[in-house]
């Protein structure tokens, strides 16, 4: 049986960030509320010349360039987002044009809150696996701007970014057997954004309850599909990456997993197992959410990139459990089987380099970015070109005849 999975991955984050220390000072709260309470340190801030389209294209261009992939070989282009720019025209269509992907390609957008990226990935893997041509590839992109009300309780968990994955047969990074996936879904209102609302409505406590309920449900099916007894799952995975709207959500999730897998053990033993497995299996994937914040659909895959950059060759040949959750709600637990030689892919990630090259902004500058929507700004081509750099290949310049313009 031919393996199908991910051959390469790339991330794009905006060039600005606001520190949580600066945000706490402006909001008149102790910095520990954000840094210790959430576990975060910074949040990405997107400028007016970027949006979900530019971030998606900028992440995807990295993948195409470093793998030397012919855009004509892309058979399926999926963009998952809850930050769409048009009620009808898909973000994926804009990206298709910017990347010059051919017409013999299935192009569409997926929406299911933060779970949408995994839904698009699983669908692409299944489609590529059914296609007889080994040259056919899928390009799956997650792109989002997590934006809450100015001064809202969720403001400190904001962020922005995009992740792109290249899907094909005989993958170079990891294989994924989707028949093993554990899924869970239920109709709930834990996080939603009604039509016409610029920011979401969040029932924070209930959303965490839904997340943990979905984790338990998807893990149960995943374990059953693997044929494992309860209590054996932790030994089957070298690392675990949870969906992380904020850093400490990974702690809540892992504690629940330990309670499930260590049922019957005394609390002291459970705590020992939690501390050891969190340090070894979960902590290596936390860098991105600490530095960037929540990027919705791409959050769990930013965790994968963080793990790869931190663990490097130690991740070769390992098994990584992935828990993807989206409000509303839908969830899936997957297993990534890493290939044994991925050093070249890891060396081409440059995530830490992107983070280091960002510019810190003041709270006043953050206020200006927040108050000006992209619909109110237009940049002439010469001015817009000045915003480009090694990672920012595409920028938004405004509207012409109600059509979004990019260069």
What are these regions (language model features)?
Residues 33-37, 41-53, 84-137, 143, ...:
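Conserved catalytic cysteine-centered active-site region
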Residues 205-226, 231-259, 288, 293:
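A conserved active-site cap/scaffold subdomain adjacent to cofactor or substrate pockets
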Residues 264-265, 279-356:
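C-terminal catalytic subdomain
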Residues 129-164:
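Flexible, glycine-rich active-site loops centered on histidine and acidic residues
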Residues 30, 53-67, 91, 210-227, ...:
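Short, well-ordered amphipathic alpha-helical segments that serve as non-catalytic structural scaffolds
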Residues 6, 52-118, 229-257:
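Conserved beta-ketoacyl condensing-enzyme motif
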């Amino acid at each position: 049986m031919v393996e199908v999975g991910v051959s390469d991955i790339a991330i794009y984050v905006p060039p600005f960030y606001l520190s949580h220390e600066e945000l706490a000072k402006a909001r008149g709260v102790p910095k520990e509320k954000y840094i210790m309470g959430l576990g975060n340190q910074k949040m990405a801030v997107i400028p007016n010349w970027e949006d979900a389209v530019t971030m998606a294209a900028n992440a995807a261009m990295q993948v195409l360039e470093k793998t030397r992939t012919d855009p004509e070989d892309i058979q399926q282009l999926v963009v998952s987002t809850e930050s769409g720019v048009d009620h009808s025209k898909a973000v994926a269509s804009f990206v298709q044009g910017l990347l010059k992907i051919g017409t013999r390609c299935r192009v569409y957008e997926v929406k299911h809150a933060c779970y949408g990226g995994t839904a698009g990935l699983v669908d692409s893997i299944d489609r590529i696996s059914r296609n007889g041509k080994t040259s056919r590839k899928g390009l799956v992109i997650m792109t989002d701007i997590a934006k809450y009300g100015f001064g809202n309780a969720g403001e400190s968990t904001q962020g922005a970014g995009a992740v792109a994955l290249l899907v094909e047969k005989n993958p170079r990074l990891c294989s994924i057997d989707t028949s093993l996936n554990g899924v869970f879904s239920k109709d709930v209102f834990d996080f939603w954004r009604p039509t016409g609302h610029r920011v979401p409505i969040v029932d924070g406590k209930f959303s965490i309850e839904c997340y943990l309920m979905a984790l338990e449900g998807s893990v149960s099916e995943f374990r059953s599909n693997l044929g494992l007894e309860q209590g054996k799952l932790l030994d089957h995975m070298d690392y675990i990456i949870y969906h992380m709207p904020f850093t400490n959500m990974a702690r809540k999730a892992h504690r629940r997993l330990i309670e499930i897998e260590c049922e019957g053990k005394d609390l002291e033993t459970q705590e020992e197992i939690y501390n050891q497995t969190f340090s070894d299996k979960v902590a290596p994937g936390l860098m991105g959410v600490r530095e960037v914040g929540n990027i919705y659909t791409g959050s769990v895959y930013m965790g994968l990139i963080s793990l790869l950059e931190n663990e490097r060759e130690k991740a070769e040949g390992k098994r990584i459990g992935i828990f993807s959750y989206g409000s509303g709600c839908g969830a899936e637990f997957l297993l990534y089987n890493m290939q044994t030689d991925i050093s070249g892919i890891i060396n081409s990630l440059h995530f830490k380099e992107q983070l280091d090259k960002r510019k810190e902004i003041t709270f006043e500058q953050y206020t200006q970015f927040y108050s000006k929507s992209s619909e109110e700004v237009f940049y002439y081509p010469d001015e817009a070109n000045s915003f480009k750099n090694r990672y920012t290949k595409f920028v938004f310049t405004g509207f012409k005849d109600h059509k979004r313009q990019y260069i």
